[in-house]
Amino acid sequence: MEKTVYSVEGVALRSVELDESVFGLSVNRGVIYYAINSELSNKRLGTACTKGRSEVHGSNTKPYKQKGTGRARRGDKKSPLLVGGGTIFGPKPRDFHYALPKKVKRLAMKSLLSLKAQGDALTVIEDFTVESGKTRDLIQVLRHFAQRERTVFILQNDDALLKRAGRNIPTLSFLSYNRLRAHDLFYGRKVLVLETAVHKIADFYRSKDAAQDGTY
């Protein structure tokens, strides 16, 4: 599969060959679902906590006698039926974390990259940086490729200047080639990849797959 490499001015420069084992797979939507669900679950703090009837502070005294008042029966003021009483089956702190098998996670990332590459969502840009670190300079580049869409920028290294220039753009997020996130890739309307990052992504997943198979 070939993709056109664009300059920062939006001019087509050359073609780059995308690795079919990473960018040309049939899309497995099942593993994509599990990968996104895992990421979102792992972000949950799980700190929600309510008090049950036995934990609410208060007297255990019966508020009035059982019979003869014409009112409903009451055991104590901590009843879940009363304001300020305990909560029935309320949430308690819990751990929502669950880890996907590494092989499944890699398949999800490759499926997402293939999904974006097979459409028009993925664009390859020549390597560049924003020397000034200014947002306006990065916007001049982005306006050729994304018009206010939710955009993901995949970098080949930790470019502090480029990230500084983009941190004021709410629709833009940066990912490293070896730390992709399924949620960002799936919901990104545009995926911009630096040319070097394309090769690094392919090398990274090839080496991981080879290590898994015992051939690396």
Curated annotation (Swiss-Prot):
One family name in Pfam for this protein: Ribosomal_L4
Keyword rRNA-binding: yes
Annotated transmembrane regions: none
Gene3D superfamilies named in the record: 3.40.1370.10
SUPFAM superfamilies in alphabetical order: Ribosomal protein L4
GO biological process, one term: translation
Stated role: One of the primary rRNA binding proteins, this protein initially binds near the 5'-end of the 23S rRNA. It is important during the early stages of 50S assembly. It makes multiple contacts with different domains of the 23S rRNA in the assembled 50S subunit and ribosome. Forms part of the polypeptide exit tunnel.
Subunit note: Part of the 50S ribosomal subunit.
Protein family membership: Belongs to the universal ribosomal protein uL4 family.
Record's protein name: Large ribosomal subunit protein uL4
Organism from which the protein derives: Treponema pallidum (strain Nichols)
Gene name tied to this protein: rplD
